Amino acid sequence: MSDPLLFVLLGPTGSGKTSLSIALAERFGGEIVNCDSVAVYRELDIGTAKPTHEERESVPHHLFDVLPPTEPMTAGEYARRAREVLKDIASRGKLPIVVGGTGLYLRALLDGLFAGPERSEELREHLRRREQERGPTYLHRILSRMDRVAAAKIHPNDAAKLIRAIEVCLAARKPMTELWQQGRDPLTGFRILRIGLDPDRPALYDRINRRAAEMFEQGLVEETQALLAKYGRIGGPLDSLGYRQAFELLDGKLTREQAVAAAQQGHRNYAKRQMTWFRREPEVRWLKGFGDDAAIVGEAMQIIKTS
């Protein structure tokens, strides 16, 4: 008896993954598993472009809204939870459909991650203080000297990931990328089918620009204001794209027009980094279009039927 099928849908932000995943889930009796590092958090709705309540009612969705924004979700913890969900879905005879754009989460889920050293709160606090003293790019410059490959994969403003990478390099006394291949625990028990969305770049950027502007129109600043009142400046998911620019607007550092433009630019840059990461994924069947194009939906369905 062959292993059950696991369908993985990759693609940059704005490429129509949600639309395609729901169409496939409805057609093949599937259940959708989130693989986005910000969508796991409750109360962050407008800035994450999560599936709507109506979309979530049409087919089962998993690993959305599972944590408050004060609790960190590491890639390893995500992989542990997601593997449990995948096994449960498959045990009920349903098709698990992993959807998302966070490359590190996907790698942790499918390939496993090395067991890194324990966290050092003393070192972390020291690095946070140094960043405050020397500016927002300080941590990225430090990591670039220790591990250029890791630094290239982490956004210069993502302090949490930069601190963890520096911590690992110092504890192991070698670049973190050398450790990534050690002690991994790849996912077994599934036939993995990967499909990636690769829409026309100018058309994708146009969609990204429109969606980022719509987030502000739909109340992103007000949502950010409510999160600030409830949790304070906690960083983490509240430092993600959109929310970061909303904070700068609230602080008076940007006008509304500037905040929208900065969010648009940030999302475009993020889409470019996502595609760079996903191009390194093995055995991906790339579809040249958006996930809500009828031709792309039909092509994806045909691939699943013959797998």
UniProtKB/Swiss-Prot annotation:
Enzyme class, spelled out: transferase
SUPFAM superfamilies linked to this entry: P-loop containing nucleoside triphosphate hydrolases (SSF52540)
* Gene3D superfamilies, alphabetized: 1.10.20.140, P-loop containing nucleotide triphosphate hydrolases (3.40.50.300)
Disulfide bonding pattern of the chain:
none
Return one GO MF term: ATP binding
Q: Name one GO biological process term.
A: tRNA modification
Superkingdom: Bacteria
Which reactions does this protein catalyse?
adenosine(37) in tRNA + dimethylallyl diphosphate = N(6)-dimethylallyladenosine(37) in tRNA + diphosphate
Cofactors per UniProt?
Mg(2+)
- In which residues is ATP bound? 11-18
Residues that hold substrate according to the record: 13-18
Q: Which HAMAP family match?
A: IPP_trans
Q: Which family does it belong to?
A: Belongs to the IPP transferase family.
Oligomeric state and interaction partners are given as: Monomer.
PANTHER family given for it?
A: TRNA DIMETHYLALLYLTRANSFERASE
Q: What is this protein called?
A: tRNA dimethylallyltransferase
Q: Which gene encodes it?
A: miaA
